[in-house]
């Protein structure tokens, strides 16, 4: 039985931490290492961690300074001893068969990543989200959790997280993608429970946080590390598509209702940034609805609507409508 390391960054989650840890300790899979990283949490999370560590149930790493979610994960990854690693956010929780399901899938193929769906928990209301088998499950399904990784693959390719306060999973997923991992998708499993914590960084984003700036910075840093001139054309087009998807999400999901003046600024930034990074984006074959059958319907429609209005010169009107809804 291969060892699996579960990595849990901890910051300001005392209300939910025991639920998370108990779900990890209640697994049907036995060979588990649990590494918790206290990222200078200002609440009583450390007292809870001490309780579990004294019982010999977890190992605790304490950061000397606040590193953020991604770098805390990376620090634990470098100290892990498992054959496989999984990331768990400390306000989330997992089903009892979670690790066993992923480990069984890993066992049946020489995979670098096994990917599953998740169950979104918003105020006790649960909705399952499933993933389809395709390259897009690695690239644009950007949640770092709900996946199992071969530890040696991550270390061999120096795949890690960047020090941003939001969107670190976008960079991590793109870095995985360009190294062409062998992957498998469990299309009918959603044993990761993603709890919508309104106090978390992503849960508290609003129009004033300028998420489009975060997205731009993440792609700048990715392109700096992996220059587009060195990319295979198909990889380049998919990275370009992923940029557009994330920018549309920044404008529509996090920017709706922000007012016309704010949206004008956001949209003009998006288009200028798109031209600077991917000046030939209109030639991208993946921007056509029919090419993206294995992408989620929501994403396909969002990109197709954007491209249609862009083509006929009415894209600004579309986003101004979103600005006041």
Please describe what each predicted stretch is.
Residues 97-127:
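Conserved donor NDP-sugar-binding/catalytic core segment of glycosyltransferases
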Residues 134-209:
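Conserved nucleotide-sugar donor-binding catalytic segment
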Residues 63-80:
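Glycine-rich, basic loop-to-helix element that forms the pyrophosphate-binding segment
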Residues 12-26:
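Short, well-formed alpha-helical segments that are part of the catalytic scaffolds
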Residues 190-197, 204-233, 241-278:
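Catalytic core of nucleotide-sugar-dependent glycosyltransferases
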Residues 256-325:
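Membrane-interface aromatic/basic loop that binds lipid-linked glycans or pyrophosphate carriers
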Residues 23, 38-47, 65, 89:
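A conserved acidic beta->alpha catalytic loop
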Residues 85:
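Short aromatic/hydrophobic "clamp" motif used to bind/position activated sugar donors
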């Amino acid at each position: 039985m291969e060892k699996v390391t579960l990595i849990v960054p901890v910051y300001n989650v005392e209300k939910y931490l025991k639920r998370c840890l108990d779900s990890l300790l209640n697994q049907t899979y036995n060979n588990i290492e649990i590494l918790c990283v206290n990222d200078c949490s200002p609440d009583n999370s450390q007292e809870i961690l001490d309780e579990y560590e004294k019982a010999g149930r977890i190992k605790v790493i304490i950061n000397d300074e606040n590193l953020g979610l991604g770098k805390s994960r990376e620090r634990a990854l470098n100290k892990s001893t498992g054959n496989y690693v999984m990331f768990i956010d400390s306000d989330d929780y997992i089903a009892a068969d979670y690790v066993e399901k992923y480990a069984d899938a890993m066992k049946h193929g020489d995979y670098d990543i096994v990917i599953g769906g998740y169950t979104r928990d918003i105020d006790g209301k649960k909705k399952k989200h499933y993933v389809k088998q395709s390259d897009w499950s690695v690239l644009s399904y950007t949640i770092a959790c709900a996946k199992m990784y071969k530890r040696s693959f991550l270390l061999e390719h120096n795949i890690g997280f960047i020090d941003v306060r939001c969107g670190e999973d976008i960079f991590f997923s793109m870095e995985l993608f360009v190294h062409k991992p062998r992957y498998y998708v469990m299309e009918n499993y959603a044993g990761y429970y993603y709890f919508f914590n309104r106090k978390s960084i992503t849960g508290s984003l609003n129009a004033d946080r300028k998420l489009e700036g975060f997205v731009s910075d993440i792609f700048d840093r990715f392109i700096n590390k992996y220059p587009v001139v060195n990319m295979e054309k198909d990889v380049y087009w998919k990275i370009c598509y992923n940029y557009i998807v994330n920018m549309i999400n920044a404008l529509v999901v996090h920017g709706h209702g922000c007012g016309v003046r704010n949206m004008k600024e956001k949209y003009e930034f998006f288009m200028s940034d798109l031209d600077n990074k991917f000046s030939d984006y209109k030639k991208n074959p993946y921007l056509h609805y029919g090419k993206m059958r294995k992408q989620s319907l929501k994403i396909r429609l969002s990109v197709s609507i954007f491209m249609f209005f862009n083509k006929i010169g009415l894209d600004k009107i579309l986003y101004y409508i979103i600005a006041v809804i």
